[in-house]
């Protein structure tokens, strides 16, 4: 207003369905069975390559609170490479936070069939400290996964309508608060199913075709302002 700046058009990323597939593509059921995780055991899933940004330390702290109460629940984190990342072994760092239940914390690494893992998961969790636009959350919702995210800057609140198609927690929510909500959802398959079914709507809301139309409409408006 004061600097006479031109109007800006900001569009989110689209989601293509089905999600792209590429190698490696380990079957989640077979991969987990080799680690004594049966198809009937509940699975918490997180995805990301940067542990601190994604709040995986928060996630592991929460899981530590739940592990004794739910001995059959496992936590899978996709995307973290083995060995040092910018001088830090992220997998080892997280395992050290969970000494009593580290055998229930699994790191398949980077996979190219993430859709299969979303569909295997009972809950998708994103306790990020900050985001740009969380593609992994968009993908999980498009897969019909029940999702819980921190309401961090920026992005999750653009995707999740709290209590309608997912759940949002304050960015500074404690591990205890996370554990309470995750416990509620683990014990309520009906609520998980309702939230996951409603989340499928992002396939239309963030489709390539719809965002293409939004872009063209925005361009026409910007040109018309000249």
Regions found by a protein language model. Name each.
Residues 208-226:
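C-terminal alpha-helical cap of glycosyltransferases
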Residues 110, 129:
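Aromatic "clamp/platform" in nucleotide-sugar-dependent glycosyltransferases that forms part
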Residues 38-54, 60-63:
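Conserved donor-binding/catalytic core segment of Leloir-type glycosyltransferases
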Residues 21-37, 92-94:
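A short helix/loop element that forms part of the nucleotide-sugar donor recognition site in Leloir-type
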